[in-house]
Amino acid sequence: LLMNFLKNSEKYNHWLPIITVMVECGLRAGEATGLRWEDINLDTGEISVNHTLIYYSHREKGCLYGINTPKTEAGNRIVPMTPEVKAAFVQEREYQKKTGISCKVTIDGYTDFIFVNRFGECQHHSTINKGIDRIIRDCNEEQLAKCESGTIKPKNLVLLPKFSCHSLRHTCATRLCEA
C-alpha cells in the first residue's frame, strides 16, 4: 500500500527513492542520509556503507551535522542493490536534474550526498519522519474516501499504521527472515 501510494502520488513521489532504499536495504537513517553518489555503483549494483551522518548539539555552535563510523564494526559493509533500489537511485538522480537540486554542503570533507532537501542540504531523520507522518495521513484519508465511495469494501480496507524511518529497517529484516 505504501509503495503504491508513493508511486502514484505526485505530491509524495519524491519520497519514494529514500524510502525504497531504506526498506530494501535495511539501512539506518544516518547510513541512508549519509550516502554519497560515490558510495553507490549502479554498474555492479553495490552500495558501500562506510560512514553515517550524525546530527549533534554543540555547546557554542548549536546543532551540527557530522560524519561518523557506522554504529558497529559489521556496519562497514557492501549492500547489494535490488532492481527497485537501482531504479530508486536513477529516479533520484533524474528528479534532481529536473528540479536543479544538488548537494550544496560539505560535512567533515564529505560532499555530494544523494538524499538532499530542496535547499541542497542533507535530509535529517526527523524531516523524513515528518514526511512519513504526512504520507500515512494522506494515504489513509484516500483509503477511507475509497471505502466511503464504495470503491473499496469495508472488509478490504487497509490503513497504514504509524511508523518511523527506523521501522523501515525492521521491515527489511522481517522480509529477509520470511524469504
What spans do the regions from the language model cover?
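Short, basic (Lys/Arg/His-rich) helix/loop patches that form interaction surfaces
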Residues: N4-W15, C25, V79, Y95-V105, ...
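Alpha-helix N-cap/helix-start motif at helix boundaries, enriched for small hydrophobics
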Residues: I18, G26, G30-L35, M81
